[in-house]
């Protein structure tokens, strides 16, 4: 068997690949920088956080290999507003083409639209515990961080144009420099066309002639002027050099990117190599999060699922689990997935603390490693009480108003959680369940595939529950139904837990069924028979 690398995860393998690559390139290993570029032009969704979380996990993996790493969050707040995201005021339409930091905040709580949007993402990163060095594009251009790279790119504008055409077929930079000045007359950025570089003066000449944005023509004001790139009076085109400029100026060694910008990354890789003489960072491509209808979750189409929504019903670690458990492939995701990830996090914790045995050493290492990354290498010292999300939401639904927490804790102790204490973690979990019940009627039940023998046993249980009311007798009749139908009792209990709680374990079944209400349990079991029955006999 091959040796396990680091903590056995994909992130550890990438970290080793980065280190070996940097050695081959002969570059310093004193500080290895990882970057995420983040937009400020729309409401940040869970995909925005996903990109940052995955890049940060690589930065952590480099540290776990014994190297200093720094994680940079680069805010694209010099970009212009290309469209008004759905749900925001139509009055913002008049600001299309303006830099997002010059667009007023429609919520009137920040200095600008861009400031508001980036604050939402940074708030989510802080909630997750992600540590980062924040760099604002506005400040980077103004401070001269990218001056050398801008100059080299503008001096080689014809070569940049050929690279863009080779890689994408676009010819727009045959007539324009890959630089957008901010028009000093109307204030827009995308309507300007830079047509001449004055290297001695550090300036470009431009005309504000207009530009097609999102399928419609945005008319320029006609002004002709000059912009000083050394003073941050414009920005590079991100498709034709800005990524490359950042990589070289900041000595970035790794950056993952979304499938939707693959062409731009390919162009920037070549610009970095062929024009800036800097071997670009190692990359990994990830795919998009989709909503349940299969559409890409997007700032502009109105199906935004934000980290803040997730944090109302689930922990930051459960969201990081969604982000980090798999890197490739698109995933359909919605708020209804939160209970599943909360329960899955508990299962990972059982593996990490040795309460659940995984025989395969590599699989065990990968899962315990994933748990560490979900906790950003600061896992808890001891396991927390694992109470199924469905159980908490049921108790939250029937709890008397004003004393919900006391009621839930008392009931849990009666269900067999005898040593339960009201820790901060338990308070948070109860809070998630209470929020769920306030906002949603119930958790969508999951389908469970049943063998024919399990199906027969469940039919027996349904019949018995129509007359039996005592918890202890209900507990015993489940054992009897299992034996009578040739099903291992442990397997039948696991199946019942999956049907009723969405996970393979839970509180003592007899008292739980009484508390849930026999009619409710019968309904759930009948639904399971309808949806999951008919597979071959198995014990």
Specify the residue positions occupied by each region the protein language model found.
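Residue-level signal for inorganic ion chemistry
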Residues: 45, 153, 268, 315, ...
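The substrate-binding groove and active-site-proximal loops of carbohydrate-active enzymes
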Residues: 40-47, 100-112, 138, 142, ...
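Charged, often glycine-rich, active-site loop that binds/positions anionic groups
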Residues: 79-95, 149-150, 296
């Amino acid at each position: 068997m091959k040796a396990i690398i680091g903590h056995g995860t994909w992130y550890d393998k990438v970290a080793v690949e980065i280190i070996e690559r940097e050695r081959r390139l002969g570059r310093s290993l004193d500080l290895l920088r990882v970057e995420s570029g983040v937009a400020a032009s729309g409401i940040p969704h869970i995909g925005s956080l996903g990109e940052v979380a995955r890049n940060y996990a690589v930065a952590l993996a480099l540290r776990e290999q014994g190297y200093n790493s720094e994680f940079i969050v680069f805010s694209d707040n010099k970009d212009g507003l290309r469209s008004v995201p759905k749900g925001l005021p139509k009055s913002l339409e008049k600001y299309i083409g303006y830099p997002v930091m010059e667009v007023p905040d429609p919520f009137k709580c920040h200095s600008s639209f861009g400031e508001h949007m980036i604050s939402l993402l940074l708030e989510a990163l802080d909630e997750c515990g992600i540590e980062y060095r924040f760099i604002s594009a506005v400040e980077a251009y103004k401070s001269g961080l990218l001056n050398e790279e801008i100059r080299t790119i503008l001096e080689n504008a014809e070569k940049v144009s050929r690279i863009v055409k080779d890689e994408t077929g676009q010819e727009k930079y045959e007539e324009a420099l890959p630089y957008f000045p901010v028009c000093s007359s109307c204030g827009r950025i995308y309507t300007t066309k830079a047509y001449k570089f004055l290297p001695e003066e550090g300036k470009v000449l431009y005309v504000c002639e207009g530009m097609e944005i999102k399928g419609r023509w945005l008319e320029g004001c006609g002004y002709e002027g000059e912009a000083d790139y050394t003073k941050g009076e414009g920005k590079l085109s991100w498709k034709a050099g800005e990524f490359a400029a950042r990589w070289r100026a900041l000595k970035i060694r790794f950056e993952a990117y979304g499938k939707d910008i693959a062409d731009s990354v390919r162009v920037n890789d070549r610009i970095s190599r062929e024009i800036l003489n800097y071997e670009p960072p190692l990359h990994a491509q990830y795919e998009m999060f989709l909503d349940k209808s299969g559409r890409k979750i997007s700032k502009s189409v109105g199906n935004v699922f934000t980290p803040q929504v997730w944090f109302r019903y689930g922990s930051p670690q459960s969201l990081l689990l969604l982000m980090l458990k798999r890197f490739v492939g698109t995933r359909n995701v919605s708020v209804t997935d939160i209970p599943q990830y909360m329960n899955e996090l508990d299962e990972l914790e059982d593996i990490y603390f040795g309460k659940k045995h995984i025989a395969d050493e590599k699989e065990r290492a990968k899962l315990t490693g994933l748990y560490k990354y979900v906790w950003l290498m600061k896992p808890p010292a001891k396991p927390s009480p694992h109470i199924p999300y469905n159980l908490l939401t049921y108790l939250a639904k029937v709890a008397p108003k004003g004393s919900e927490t006391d009621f839930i804790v008392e009931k849990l102790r009666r269900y067999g959680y005898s040593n339960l204490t009201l820790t901060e973690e338990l308070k948070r979990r109860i809070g998630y369940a209470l929020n769920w019940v306030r906002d949603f009627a119930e958790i969508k039940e999951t389908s469970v595939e049943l063998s024919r023998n399990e199906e027969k046993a469940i039919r027996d249980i349904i019949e018995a529950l129509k007359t039996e009311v005592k918890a202890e007798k209900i507990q015993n009749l489940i054992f009897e139904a299992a034996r009578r139908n040739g099903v291992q009792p442990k397997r039948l209990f696991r199946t019942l837990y999956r049907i009723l709680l969405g996970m393979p374990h839970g509180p003592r079944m007899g008292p739980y069924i009484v508390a849930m209400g026999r009619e409710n349990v019968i309904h759930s079991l009948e639904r399971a028979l309808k949806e999951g029955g008919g597979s071959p006999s198995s014990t």
